[in-house]
């Protein structure tokens, strides 16, 4: 209520974690258009609880997936998210669509509230942010089961090439145009 009273909540506000949040507070977030970023590994690592992701979805709150700097690997966070939500709900068949939706759809929607150029989508005029994975699936791979491969097969270390805003920054597992020794010396 303090955040609402002081005018902090709104369509450009993102709250992290939201672990101990009541249904009434969820309603406030929905009514103000406030977003939530769930950071499952951080929550587990700090033993602070589990965000009620499925309830936030049911309330119509835009919730994305983050890392809280606990990892740099979004696929790792995705893999933790699904079993964590299933464990929290004591239901082994929930959360599939929500988990991948948070990373691939909702994170793009969140970015759209902050940036003019579309991010997280492949379409003309959008930032050409793409990763190319070196992944050899053991089972058939198609657009219909890509989520399963992301959750159970791929890992961040499979990333072979990274393109950001149309510029290749990492190719064949080597940085392009970046002096790693110079950066490491500075660190």
Predicted regions and their residues:
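Active-site core of metal-dependent hydrolases
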Residues: 1-72, 89-94
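Ser/Thr-centric signal marking residues that sit
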Residues: 13, 67, 104, 161-162
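Short Asp/Glu-rich motifs
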Residues: 48-49, 75-76, 144
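Flexible loop residues that form catalytic
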Residues: 18-19, 86, 136, 167
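His/Asp/Glu-enriched, well-ordered alpha-helical/loop segment
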Residues: 6-8, 52-137, 151-154
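C-terminal cap of metal-dependent C-N hydrolases
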Residues: 127-177, 184
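Asparagine-centered polar/low-complexity signal
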Residues: 39, 43, 106-107, 165
């Amino acid at each position: 209520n303090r955040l609402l009273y002081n005018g902090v909540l709104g369509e450009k506000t993102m709250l992290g974690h939201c672990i101990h949040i009541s249904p009434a507070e969820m309603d406030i977030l929905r009514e103000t258009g406030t977003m939530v970023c769930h950071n499952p590994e951080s929550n587990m690592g700090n033993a602070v609880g589990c965000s009620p992701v499925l309830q936030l979805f049911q309330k119509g709150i835009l919730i994305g997936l983050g890392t809280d700097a606990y990892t740099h690997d979004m696929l790792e966070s995705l893999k933790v998210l699904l079993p964590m939500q299933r464990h929290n709900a004591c239901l082994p068949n929930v959360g599939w669509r929500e988990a991948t939706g948070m990373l691939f759809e909702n994170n793009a929607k969140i970015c759209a509230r902050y940036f003019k150029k579309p991010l997280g989508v492949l379409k003309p005029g959008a930032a050409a942010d793409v990763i190319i994975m070196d992944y050899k699936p053991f089972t058939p791979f198609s657009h219909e089961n890509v989520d399963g491969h992301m959750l159970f097969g791929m890992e961040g270390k499979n990333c072979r090439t990274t393109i950001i805003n149309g510029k290749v920054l990492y190719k064949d597992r080597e940085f392009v145009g970046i002096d790693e020794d110079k950066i490491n010396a500075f660190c």
